Amino acid sequence: MVTVIVQEGEPIEKVLKRFKARVEQEQILTELKRREYYEPPSERKKKRERNRRKKILKALKKQQQLI
């Protein structure tokens, strides 16, 4: 959990900037997005395979355009 201690007389903008930096440093938002929807391992595998095929097809199309 991220905690930021506010000093007396410190501008709120500075505190927010420090808070955002700590959240980013601890990768809280990326972890939250990753865990937002559970994806079973089988789905992850299928998704990786689809992306791999898409990438290969894209490379082939690009290569054929150059010829």
From Swiss-Prot:
Q: Which GO terms describe its biological process?
A: translation
What Gene3D superfamilies would the database entry show? Answer: Ribosomal protein S8
Q: What is the top-level taxon of the source organism?
A: Bacteria
Q: GO terms for molecular function, please?
A: structural constituent of ribosome
Query: Which keywords does this Swiss-Prot/TrEMBL entry list?
Result: Ribonucleoprotein, Ribosomal protein
Gene Ontology cellular component terms for the protein in this record = ribonucleoprotein complex; ribosome
Family of this protein: Belongs to the bacterial ribosomal protein bS21 family.
What PANTHER family does the record tag this protein with?
Answer: MITOCHONDRIAL 28S RIBOSOMAL PROTEIN S21, SMALL RIBOSOMAL SUBUNIT PROTEIN BS21
* Name under which the protein is recorded: Small ribosomal subunit protein bS21
Q: Which gene encodes it?
A: rpsU
